[in-house]
Amino acid sequence: DVKALEEYLEKDHDFKYAALVHCDTPSGMLNDVSKLCPLLKKYGILTLVDSVSAMFGEEMRVDDYRIDLLCGGSQKAVSAPPGLSFVTISDDAYKAMRSRKTPVASFYANILAFDGYYEKQWFPYTMPISDIYGLRQAFDNIKNDPGMLERHAKIGEAVRGAVVEAGLELYQETGFS
């Protein structure tokens, strides 16, 4: 609820970052990150969006929505083998990571381990080559399917209609993926 968040932030916005789930897989609930993230950024709050189940299945404009960190996975709407993660990082998020006062406790949780890897020709662990080939094919499929988002929406609507037609109730009335 964007209005409720705005009312809350007017009273208390003394925190560094907020984590949001773009689309919750079990419920199908879709949070409007296009409104929530700019509101948080208005108060100087970094945004971390979990879009594992929505990335490439819902419209996403990372810069326009002012998202600092966007995380996705290969196994959902991308339709690639599981095992790969995607992270987009804003300049504000990089600045915050580089200015940490305490080190990241785990090598694998430290995104800065990947900083400059392409230029250095160094990857911080074993390269998942077969997964990358699968991802390349999945991205080719996405590129060659310009109506993908509309198709996802149409299928989702049909499934919800069938659920209601069968006499079941939807978990929520609106705001679903």
Residue spans for each PLM region:
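Conserved active-site segment immediately N-terminal to the catalytic lysine
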Residues: 63-75
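Active-site phosphate-binding strand-loop segment of PLP-dependent enzymes
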Residues: 2-51, 56, 69
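Short, structured coil segments at secondary-structure junctions
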Residues: 43, 65-66, 166
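Short, well-ordered, mixed-charge alpha-helical segments that flank or form enzyme active sites
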Residues: 1-2, 25-30, 55-59, 64, ...
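Fold-independent oxyanion-binding glycine-rich loops
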Residues: 20-24, 49-52, 58, 73-75, ...
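Active-site C-terminal subdomain of aminotransferase-like
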Residues: 75-161
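Conserved PLP-binding catalytic core of the aspartate aminotransferase-like
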Residues: 169-177
